[in-house]
């Protein structure tokens, strides 16, 4: 039986109308006077810290702790502003699926497994009134490697539940092959939604446990029952 459900954010729970990508570019332009710097980055399934480090190296700037702090201070400022200017939203089926999880006879804990830095995740999810849904999580400022973020999320979930969780008791929900890979790294089950930028057929090739068009196409009882 699933005891912990870990959600990715962008392309899985919400889409921000480009606010996150724009905030990356504006922060770098504002803090380091280099415009259009984020246009070459591939964001899907990546961690914010890994993306920022790549951006620094592409522009011959030292990715020092001080420079990263300066960048992310600018990023969260712009993210908060741009979310009010872009047309994003909660993706289809998310609220109903969460309601179904809460209604299970033994509801699992709900957490986040995301490449977003924690403050960025909070800003995005508070904007869409989803932040309070989650009890635990691991983030892009915990580690640059998503597999390590998954391990941290598993450990935090175990502490929350006062139970050393086995991988098969965890369900990871995401929209990219990287979500599948990090779930496999901790032995978790995978539910993948084709609501992000990756085509259904490409996701299918990675053989997740469940693959659906969106969360309207699956019931919590299907994916959280006894194994």
Segments (PLM) and residue ranges:
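Helix-loop "lid/cap" segments that line or gate small-molecule binding pockets
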Residues: 49-63, 153-154
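Short, acidic loop-to-helix structural element flanking the phosphoryl-transfer center
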Residues: 6, 65, 80-112, 118
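An amphipathic alpha-helix signature
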Residues: 21-25, 49, 53, 72, ...
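Acidic, Mg2+-coordinating phosphoryl-transfer loop and its flanking beta/alpha structural elements
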Residues: 172-210
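Active-site neighborhood of HAD-like aspartate-dependent phosphohydrolases
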Residues: 1-44, 50, 56-58
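Structural recognition of alpha->loop->beta junctions
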Residues: 129-137, 202-221
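Short, surface-exposed acidic
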Residues: 32-42, 60-71, 131-134, 163-167
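Substrate-recognition "cap/lid" segment bordering the active-site pocket of phosphatases
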Residues: 88-89, 111, 116-172, 177-186
């Amino acid at each position: 039986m699933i005891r912990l459900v870990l959600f990715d954010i962008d392309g899985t729970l919400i889409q921000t109308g480009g606010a996150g990508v724009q905030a990356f570019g504006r922060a770098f332009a504002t803090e380091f006077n280099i415009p259009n710097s984020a246009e070459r980055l591939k964001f899907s399934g990546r961690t914010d810290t890994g993306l920022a480090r790549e951006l620094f190296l592409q522009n011959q700037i030292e990715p020092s702790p001080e420079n990263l702090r300066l960048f992310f201070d600018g990023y969260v400022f712009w993210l908060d502003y741009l979310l009010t200017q872009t047309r994003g939203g909660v993706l289809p089926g998310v609220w109903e699926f969460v309601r179904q999880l809460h209604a299970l006879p033994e509801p699992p804990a709900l957490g986040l497994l995301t490449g977003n830095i924690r403050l960025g995740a909070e800003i995005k999810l508070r904007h869409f009134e989803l932040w309070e849904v989650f009890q635990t999580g691991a983030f892009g400022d915990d580690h640059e490697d998503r597999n390590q973020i998954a391990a941290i999320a598993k450990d935090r979930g175990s502490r929350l539940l006062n139970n050393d969780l086995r991988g098969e008791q965890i369900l990871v929900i995401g929209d990219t092959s990287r979500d599948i890979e990090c779930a496999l790294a901790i032995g978790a089950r995978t539910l993948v939604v084709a609501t992000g930028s990756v085509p259904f057929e490409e996701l299918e090739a990675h053989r997740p446990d469940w693959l659906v068009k969106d969360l309207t196409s699956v019931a919590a009882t299907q994916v959280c029952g006894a194994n």
